[in-house]
Amino acid sequence: GTIDPLVLKARERGVIFDAANGKGNFGLKAAKRALAAGFLPDVISTDLTVDKFNMPPYAKNLPLVISKYLALGLDFNTIIRAVTETPARLMGLEGQIGTLKAGAIADIAIFDLKDREYVQKDFCDDEIVCSQILVPQLTMAAGEIQYCQSDFYL
């Protein structure tokens, strides 16, 4: 497929594209076509709401959204930048959040990337088979540990 010229012009004007990964508005077919055409989202986030959170087999949290993009063929570092660094820059908070630089707010998540096959679905119930999953090990907010997996050691 091709990307609508109006969409490309919007990007040239500075419109930011977020894939809005939620149960009601993310389509795997459209995502695959966009990625194949070289049209990557600027920001990768969830568009999850309280009534849709933790509903398997949909991308029910950000680690699963990241895992879905791995299955779609995106490079891990590209995904992480779209989840951290790019949103921080777009919000005018570059160097303050979304980075591990000294002096930045220490909001940190540590994951274990595990080989595990599972299925995610989109709002049309189209499926993608994922072969890797990010499993949270530790979460820090403003430098304070908020969550630590019982078998994770600092």
Each predicted region: which residue ranges?
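Histidine/acidic residue-rich metal-binding segments in metalloenzymes
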Residues: G1-F17, N25-D42
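Short acidic-hydrophobic sequence patches enriched in Asp/Glu that either
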Residues: T2, Y58-N61, S131
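Solvent-exposed alpha-helices and their adjacent loops that cap or buttress functional pockets
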Residues: K9-E12, K101-A102, V129-I133
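Short, surface-exposed, polar/charged, turn-prone segments marking secondary-structure boundaries
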Residues: G14, I44-L48, A71-D75, Q132, ...
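C-terminal amphipathic alpha-helical segment
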Residues: I16-G22, L70-A71
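Active-site beta-loop-alpha junctions enriched in small/polar residues
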Residues: A20-G24, T49-D51
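His/Asp/Glu-enriched, well-ordered alpha-helical/loop segment
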Residues: K29-L113
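C-terminal cap of metal-dependent C-N hydrolases
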Residues: I105-L154
